[in-house]
UniProtKB/Swiss-Prot annotation:
Entry GO MF terms: G protein-coupled receptor activity; photoreceptor activity; retinal binding
Modified residues (N6-(retinylidene)lysine): 306
Protein name per the record: Rhodopsin
Family recorded in the similarity comment: Belongs to the G-protein coupled receptor 1 family. Opsin subfamily.
Gene that specifies this protein: RHO
Residues lipid-modified (S-palmitoyl cysteine): 337-338
Sequence repeat windows: 395-399, 400-404, 412-416, 417-421, 422-426, 427-431
Lineage: Eukaryota, Metazoa, Spiralia, Lophotrochozoa, Mollusca
Any one GO biological process: visual perception
Entry keyword set: Cell membrane, Cell projection, Chromophore, Disulfide bond, G-protein coupled receptor, Glycoprotein, Lipoprotein, Membrane, Palmitate, Phosphoprotein, Photoreceptor protein, Receptor, Repeat, Retinal protein, Sensory transduction, Transducer, Transmembrane, Transmembrane helix, Vision
Compositionally biased spans, kind Pro residues: 388-433
Length: 455
């Protein structure tokens, strides 16, 4: 790692209690208005993140219809976002922004960076687990060994915690470092040093902690889209043998599963949009022109990343019918400005047994009907393969049928010499315009009405 500065005099970019990378000394001082704006923004985002994710955890834990294995990932994600808002947002960064420097010392800086890394990796890896669960429910509904249970979800969450800690704890053992960044009011990975140890840490962290979950997410949702296309064809086949009520329930179950998948896709998309600029800055600092990494260019991705913790409660309150119903029951004043779609709620109630059954590890009605349909199709195919048409009765068709020479047409038809040679005669029709025939006497001139002429 590049040695930090040893200047004695304290300036806007140097705090003697922490190690500051000398890269930040190249830029002009940051105006006070920027510090205060960052402090206000982080304070508001932190408070909203704490309250919003607290409501998510409370309602998902309290509401029975939301206590499914898949929603354990949602609770884990909300816990990560709440902790991220409470520790890496408000109040530490807010106070430091108003003080215009990191004031909590070196140990707090390392702890701040460590927890920020753990919670950040935990969020994206939890989203990867959500993608895997959605893929199993929608893309592989009849794979019994892949059904989610509370135990399986708990083990997956434990793995997420361990994986996140592994890729965050390196700087504690001098593999990389945690240092102030941007306008120097928060601490994160040292992405400016280019020594082999730091660069290897940045690359391993980038690919294993960031790119690998993104690849898993992309794979799962690509297969979900393909499965939905096939599912629509299967539903069209099922419509021929189901009555209207059964068909509506099956369609509602599929629609509810797709709604959950769409909510997950929205959450993952906003997370990637929030954290991708930060990843780009880290790679730019390692392999691109370092002078492009200004305090402002480094601070804006930090603000985007820290604001990602407030997106999930907003997405749930807008898109998740069951979550909205739980809010309306427990905190009705939170949705005074919103109205429920009655048809959407009715479809959600019809589909509840479908989604809950599939997520709890049971077999949904939709999956059972699909299995029944496939079994019937296999039975029909087996019957068709085993079917042998009976032999024709003896004496059929009778001998001599069709009569020879009658069908197909007898030889010599049409007769030779037909049409006769020289027909039509040469010079017919004659060349040139047809002869003009004079109008009979008493006829009106060309273009004049006959009745008007006679009158």
């Amino acid at each position: 790692m590049v040695e930090s500065t040893t200047l004695v005099n304290q300036t806007w970019w140097y705090n003697p209690t922490v190690d500051i990378h000398p890269h930040w000394a190249k830029f002009d001082p940051i105006p006070d208005a920027v510090y205060y704006s960052v402090g206000i923004f982080i304070g508001v985002v932190g408070i909203i993140g704490i309250l919003g994710n607290g409501v998510v955890i409370y309602l998902f834990s309290k509401t029975k219809s939301l206590q499914t294995p898949a929603n354990m990932f949602i609770i884990n994600l909300a816990m990560s976002d709440l902790s991220f808002s409470a520790i890496n947002g408000f109040p530490l960064k807010t106070i430091s922004a108003f003080m215009k420097k990191w004031i909590f010392g070196k140990v707090a800086c390392q702890l701040y960076g460590l927890l920020g890394g753990i919670f950040g990796f935990m969020s994206i890896n939890t989203m990867a687990m959500i993608s895997i669960d959605r893929y199993n429910v929608i893309g592989r509904p009849m794979a019994a060994s892949k059904k989610m249970s509370h135990r399986r979800a708990f083990l997956m969450i434990i793995f997420v915690w361990m994986w996140s800690i592994v890729w965050s704890v390196g700087p504690v053992f001098n593999w990389g470092a945690y240092v102030p960044e941007g306008i120097l009011t928060s601490c994160s990975f040292d992405y400016l040093s280019t020594d082999p140890s730091t660069r290897s840490f940045i690359l391993c962290m980038y690919f294993c902690g960031f790119m690998l979950p993104i690849i898993i997410i992309a794979f799962c949702y690509f297969n979900i889209v393909m499965s939905v296309s096939n599912h629509e064809k299967e539903m069209a086949a099922m419509a021929k043998r189901l009555n209207a009520k059964e068909l509506r329930k099956a369609q509602a179950g599929a629609s509810a599963e797709m709604k959950l998948a769409k909510i997950s896709m929205v959450i993952i998309t906003q997370f990637m949009l929030s954290w991708s600029p930060y990843a780009i800055i880290a790679l730019l600092a390692q392999f691109g022109p370092a002078e492009w990494v200004t305090p402002y260019a480094a601070e804006l991705p930090v603000l985007f990343a820290k604001a990602s913790a407030i997106h999930n409660p907003i997405v749930y309150s807008v898109s998740h019918p069951k979550f909205r119903e739980a809010i309306q029951t427990t905190f009705p004043w939170l949705l005074t400005c919103c109205q429920f779609d009655e048809k959407e709620c009715e479809d959600a109630n019809d589909a509840e047994e479908e989604v809950v059954a599939s997520e709890r590890g049971g077999e949904s009605r939709d999956a059972a009907q699909m299995k029944e349909m496939m079994a019937m199709m296999q039975k029909m195919q087996a019957q068709q393969a085993a079917y042998q048409p009976p032999p024709p009765p003896q004496g059929y068709p009778p001998q001599g049928y069709p009569p020879q020479g009658a069908y197909p047409p007898p030889q010599g038809y049409p007769p030779q010499g037909y049409p006769p040679q020289g027909y039509p005669p040469q010079g017919y029709p004659p060349q040139g315009a047809p002869p003009q025939v004079e109008a009979p006497q008493g006829a009106p001139p060309q273009g004049v009405d006959n009745q008007a002429y006679q009158a």
